[in-house]
Structure formats: structure tokens, C-alpha cells
Amino acid sequence: TEQAYLKTYQLGKKEEDWLAVKAKAGDNTRDGQQSEVLFIEQDYLFLKEGGMLAIVLPDGILTNSSMQYVRTQLEDWFRIVAVVSMPQTAFAANGAGVKSSVLFLKKWPKDHTEELESKKKSIEAKLLKDSDYIAKRDLWDREIRQKQKEKVNSLKSHDLKSATAIKKTQAYKEWNAELLAEYAAKIDDLKSKLTDSYLVRKQKELPDYPIFMAIAEE
């Protein structure tokens, strides 16, 4: 089956979210994963350490925020030697009109890849500790439950006595939606700040190297 096939690929599975309070249970397969993404991993497995690779990738993989996990894996597996942006019409003769780039990659030694992954995990752990992220999330969860309990008590009447019945009323539903939206915004803001801090720390602490960039003319 497709799921069994995808599970054989690292890029066929969802990556662990370092800002998740609890690990998600159940299947972590990326259903319908793009073949060009899996092709990157297949190339990595075929190459020897220090081996070179030229690969054509849709620009969406290089720019879309939803594809950040692919770019992260690329930088862990390969030294990016060069990126050449191709014209929109480069592969039109083959029926492909997607804007693409050619990446020239060199496979890192295994110990270098492991070192990069370890440093990233270390940065994540320090940011979580310094920001009291888990404690803040736990506190906010407790605040939500307490406010929900207080709201239920305030809505109790002769006709509405049970918490279950009160939570089904339109008044409670509208109030609760506003409450959850308020805390969701606080969580998103904290996550955004930590993500920005992670990128700054990663840029400072991980080894840097030049990448040749070019735009191919039609």
C-alpha cells in the first residue's frame, strides 16, 4: 500500500514538532507525498559520502513554508554547492511549466549530518528551557479550564443546572470560541517568537559556507 511504501522514507513521515506540548498519537505518514520529495531521499541513499548530485526541483520546494521540513533535511544531508534558477519555459517541451531550479549538492559525511542534527536539537532544547515554554503552555491550559468552569457556574439557573447542558447553549459556545481564540493567538505569538529565535541561533551556531547562485537565461 501507499502508506507502507511511504513509511520506508524519512521524508514520507511527518517530522516531530519541537513546539508540540504532546506528541501526536497515531499514524505519522505524509499521505500523498510528492514523488520529487521522495526522489531527494532516494538520491541521498544512492550517493557515497562526498558524492555529487545535480537535481531539478520545483521552486515550491525551495520557497513554500509548508516545505521547510524538506529544506531542513536537504541542509542536513548535503552541502548546497550551487542553485541555478531555470526559465519558466525550460521544460515546456516536455509539458512541464512549473518554475524550477537545478541544485548541485554534495553529500555530507554521516558524522557531519549527525553533528548538525544534534546541534539543532540542542538549540531547540535551550530555547524551550529559557522561555519556560512547557510551563507557560500548562499554565494557559489551566487558566482555560478554570475560566470555563467559572463561566458554567455563572450560567447556571433553575432551568440549566448541568454543565453538559450549559455547554450546549449558544451563549456558552460563543463565549468559549472567543476564549479559545484569545489563547490560540497567545500560543501562536509565542511559537512565532521561538521560531524566529531558533533561526537566529541556528545561523550563528551552525557552520556557514558560500552557495553559488545564478539565473539561467532563456
Give the residues covered by each predicted segment.
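A conserved structural/catalytic subdomain of Rossmann-like adenosyl-cofactor enzymes
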Residues: 1-218
